[in-house]
Design a protein with these regions (language model features):
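Rossmann-like AdoMet
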Residues: 1-125, 133-174
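Class I SAM-dependent methyltransferase core
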Residues: 128
Length: 175
């Protein structure tokens, strides 16, 4: 992709604080860097119009171990290309059976969204184990009748709760 070549110097500058926040700051806070992976993938989906996800967008702006600006800078060439061509190169939702590692979060997100939407009328509760910085319970399921539970390691859960409050994301739907 030729446009990306022009952005290599900018991407390198953006990559350093992005990696530092995700790895270094996460370690200092006692949270797992991988707890950010779902948030990262869904944020990218939100930016490219594949999934409306305001809670993820708001949380990403306040987390001390995530650089929304860094991610935006890294994806800017792909976003410009998308706006020019109308084609999304990343993130991509692959057809069923053609998924690859690159599509893991986006495909899994869409699959689970559909599964949850189809079954939530038959359930009483929804439990997210190892939730990390997942925000599904603050958006998609917020208005449901379900009792919602989000479980993770203590440090991750405390940081998430504090930062959701800072971002003014309504958490009242959680039990």
């Amino acid at each position: 992709i030729p446009i990306q070549i022009l952005f290599i110097p900018i991407a390198l500058v953006a990559l350093i604080p992005t990696l530092y926040k995700q790895g270094g700051v996460s370690a200092k806070l006692g949270t797992s860097a991988t707890a950010l992976e779902v948030l990262q993938g869904r944020l990218h989906m939100h930016w490219f119009g594949l999934r409306d996800d305001p809670p993820t967008h708001e949380l990403s702006k306040v987390l001390p171990n995530f650089s929304a600006l860094g991610h935006w800078t890294l994806l800017l060439p792909l976003y410009i290309l998308y706006k020019i061509s109308g084609k999304i190169f990343y993130p991509v939702i692959a057809p069923e059976g053609e998924e690859e590692v690159l599509n893991l979060v986006s495909n899994r997100t869409i699959y689970f969204d559909e599964l949850i939407s189809n079954r939530k009328g038959q359930a009483e509760q929804f439990v997210v184990l190892g939730a990390g910085f997942d925000t599904r319970c603050y958006g998609l399921l917020k208005a449901s009748h379900l009792k919602l539970f989000v479980l993770d390691q203590s440090a991750t859960q405390q940081l998430k709760k504090q930062q959701l409050n800072t971002a003014q994301v309504d958490c009242s739907s959680l039990t």
